[in-house]
């Protein structure tokens, strides 16, 4: 089937946006726009997350965007939703099903900042969203919700280790602060030093107070 320039068609809910009929173009889903927006957010900042910038980066016309999103604000909400689902909800569900041993789960949680390129990329996205949150209420609300959810999950781990409710919350806050610090201060220390810090925090967090 021939497609005219600057024309889009819909195949089973997926938009095909074609600028040049000379060659095939990529099928775009809403998630493709969300991922592209996240990349621009990390590399250039929130002010550059615009429909024209994303369309140019994806090699499509702006019309494809409006098949999936009502506005730029709608896209930004989806970016925050995707980030929250990937980094908080799916993570806690995955860890919850990985082991019933709270000691093993604690080791898994503490090791999260060191899990290769995927962890590094997740940290870059999170730092970009936190920078965005300093000037945008919607982003700040998403960050606050994610922080509260993660700290709450950590507190459940410490409760399972036998600590009282108040102490479990305090330890959860300290552990989460360490995890955030490892992302922010990722250039501090070589891999061996980072492992040493991680092992120290693991021992410290499981040690009862005198």
Give the positions of each predicted feature.
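Residues in soluble alpha-helical coiled-coils and helical-bundle/repeat scaffolds
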Residues: 70-74, 78, 96, 100, ...
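N-terminal intrinsically disordered/low-complexity leader segments
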Residues: 1-28, 209-210
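Helix-turn-helix
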Residues: 29-32, 36-74, 78
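Solvent-exposed, amphipathic alpha-helical segments
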Residues: 32, 36-44, 90-94, 129, ...
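Amphipathic alpha-helical packing segments from all-alpha helical-bundle domains
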Residues: 88, 104, 119-127, 134-162, ...
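Short, basic, alpha-helical segments at the C-terminal edge of helix-turn-helix-like DNA-binding modules
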Residues: 81-88
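Hydrophobic/aromatic-rich alpha-helical bundle segments in the mid-to-C-terminal region
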Residues: 140-144, 159-210
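Hydrophobic alpha-helical connector segments
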Residues: 78, 92-123, 175
